[in-house]
């Protein structure tokens, strides 16, 4: 969790922040949008991309690259085709319209993901030291603004929906899926970065899970201050929304901004210029309570600290036990596998079968749905490397980015499998010519109330921690996604997806995948 390059501790801000030299920092993070993508693949995946990018530019960083890690069920199943088309199109449409290149990722198939696919999105951005913005609320009397899209009823109970198993009637939760607008997000990005340059911002927070109630509590708890919010001032796109709906709506492309008192006009002018709704809905107050009013009537009053991690929110110590299948795997003897002869007649069908397998064949169809050239910074368009290299125009260096996890390895041995995921990401970074710096992770597991699933979770974290210490790549933050299972097919394979950041100081040291000339030696 700590390292020489770390500019923010894990979980301290909306995303990890790592020093890349020359007065610049990289903000990067990976998150999941699994449950929404399972029932509405297009919007579920699209809003996952939007959410992770807002986490980056909320800190004052301009996103320059996106990656994703996708897992689906049986490749030949019609539902897999439907899910895959929708998810890939959602990622592509949102990312392409938003104007950020998708530079890498992975696609994996296994029967266990048939009902519950995994959709993990990663984003990285660049910001100058001293120009970052904290997700904090402080200074009694300072105004609180809601900016971005108007609030609707989409996404209400979205956080609760993501915290339960997918049942046979999961389609009934469709209203819990948010609806995205990448063009609005592009405007919000430019307006936000312009506003930060005015110096009028005290703190800023993306509105994600649980909407207003979550963003106000997180900012207030961090600043040890309260807020008084007038919910009737929230711009809406549906008439007669009730107070609890306004509090819990997860409508996309929205931010909460706390500004310095007396500089309200600067905030309003910037967002008016970009034609983005902006409304003062409250102010910072003394004490540590959140007060929510609807037409002057107090409808909720709660200590902000009671709702956040590290405060009054409960921390559970769960029982866990090793699954029976672990001993079955340990008893397996590889020597029992019949080794084929080295004859061409016997080897060729095996090679053809392997090269045609969905997990080994080309994923070009997926990659071609994403724009990887926009921004003119992706260095792997014509000369790919094991990691994705993205040119940092401000200092002439390059970021190296990779997302990795072999779910089957983690299923067979969570400790070793998670360590292998970190090692694979580090190898990809090194093989591109860069030095590994730091990690973000997305931990996708089943129901934590299942002792065997929780055992997988504990062991995977231990293995990941061991590997990160060995490679000196601190974990900057990330996301834990539980309940990835159906009520009738059981949990998915444990999938701790590793997003790793590296730095290439000298572009002439870039390493690419292609053979260079005849006569060069090949080593294994």
Region locations from a protein language model:
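Glycine/proline-enriched, intrinsically flexible loops and inter-domain linkers
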Residues: 1-524
């Amino acid at each position: 969790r700590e390292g020489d390059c770390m500019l923010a501790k894990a979980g301290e801000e909306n995303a990890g922040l790592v020093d890349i030299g020359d007065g610049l920092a990289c903000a990067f993070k990976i998150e999941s949008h699994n449950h929404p993508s399972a029932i509405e693949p297009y919007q579920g995946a699209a809003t996952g991309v939007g959410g992770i990018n807002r986490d980056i530019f909320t800190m004052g960083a301009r996103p320059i690259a996106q990656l994703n890690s996708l897992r689906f069920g049986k490749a030949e199943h019609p539902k897999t085709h439907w899910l895959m088309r929708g998810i890939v199109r959602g990622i592509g449409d949102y990312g392409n319209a938003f104007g950020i290149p998708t530079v890498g990722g992975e696609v994996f198939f296994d029967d266990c993901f048939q009902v519950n696919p995994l959709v993990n999105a990663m984003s990285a951005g660049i910001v100058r030291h001293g120009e970052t913005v904290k997700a904090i609320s402080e200074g009694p009397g300072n105004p609180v603004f809601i900016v971005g899209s108007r609030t609707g009823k989409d996404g209400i109970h979205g956080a609760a929906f993501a915290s339960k198993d997918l049942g046979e009637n999961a389609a009934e939760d469709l209203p819990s899926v948010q609806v995205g607008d990448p063009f609005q997000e592009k405007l919000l990005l430019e307006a936000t970065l312009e506003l930060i340059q005015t110096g009028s911002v005290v703190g800023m927070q993306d509105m994600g899970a649980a909407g207003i109630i979550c963003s106000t509590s997180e900012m207030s708890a961090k600043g040890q201050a309260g807020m008084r919010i007038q919910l009737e001032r929230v711009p809406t796109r549906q008439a007669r929304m009730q107070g609890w709906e306004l509090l819990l709506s997860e409508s996309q492309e929205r931010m909460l901004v706390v500004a310095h008192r007396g500089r309200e006009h600067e905030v309003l002018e910037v967002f008016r210029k970009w034609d983005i709704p902006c409304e003062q809905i409250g102010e910072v107050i003394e004490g540590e309570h959140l007060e929510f009013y609807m037409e002057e009537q107090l409808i909720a009053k709660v200590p902000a600290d009671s709702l956040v991690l590290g405060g009054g929110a409960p921390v559970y110590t769960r029982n866990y036990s090793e699954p029976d299948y672990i001993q079955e795997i340990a008893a397996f003897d590889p020597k029992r596998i019949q080794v084929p002869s080295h004859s061409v007649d016997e080897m060729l069908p095996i090679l053809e079968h392997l090269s045609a397998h969905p997990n080994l064949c080309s994923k070009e169809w997926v990659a071609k749905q994403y724009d990887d050239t926009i921004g003119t910074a992706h260095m792997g368009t014509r000369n790919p490397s094991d990691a994705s290299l993205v040119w940092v125009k401000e200092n002439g260096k390059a970021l190296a980015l990779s997302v990795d996890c072999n779910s089957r390895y983690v299923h067979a041995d969570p400790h070793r499998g998670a360590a292998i995921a970190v090692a694979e990401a580090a190898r990809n970074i090194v093989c591109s010519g860069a030095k590994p710096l730091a990690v973000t992770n997305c931990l996708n597991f089943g129901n934590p109330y299942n002792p065997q699933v929780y055992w997988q979770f504990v062991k995977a974290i231990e293995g990941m921690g061991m590997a990160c210490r060995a490679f000196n790549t601190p974990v900057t933050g990330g996301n834990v996604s539980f309940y990835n299972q159906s009520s009738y097919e059981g949990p998915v394979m444990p999938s701790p997806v590793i997003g790793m950041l590296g730095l290439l100081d000298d572009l002439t040291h870039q390493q690419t995948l292609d053979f260079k000339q005849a006569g060069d030696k090949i080593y294994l």
